[in-house]
């Protein structure tokens, strides 16, 4: 494993109002290479969060960097017989609704939800939803819905988030749709 300089969470804490849209895009484009490999190998991370995204600076000015995803401890592979996972795993505040609700089965779209939460936090420095227990977080998600996106001013970023933060995983954007979203063009 490579030696990294910091986590994305600590870098975010150093900003006044969150990252610019351009910086978010730069980070995501690098992470997308990791996500594509995970998707191709049917790996679900289940704990994508800012503390698990590492930064390695490539110059002293910290203008060039490499982004890595860490902590695959609770990741799992979806096999061809069962396209779903069943284990309750992850960090509560970032967990997809289908995991929080103890749904009997969930798939790789749970990582897309977590990614939406992370992107929102990178832009605003805040979590879109709150609560200390699963049912409190779920209630907040249902109550606020996508109205939390009103603070996002960039149209393409807002559209991407509106497709990631969809309660019903069957209606949530797919990985292929995510990779091809206009935000990345």
Language model segments and positions:
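Conserved short submotifs of the Hanks-type protein kinase catalytic core
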Residues: 2-7
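Activation segment signature within eukaryotic-like protein kinase domains
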Residues: 27-28
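Catalytic-loop of the protein kinase fold
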Residues: 39-56
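Conserved activation segment of eukaryotic-like protein kinases, specifically the C-terminal portion
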Residues: 85-99
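Conserved end of the kinase activation segment
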Residues: 98-109
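Terminal C-lobe "cap" of eukaryotic-type protein kinase domains
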Residues: 166-185
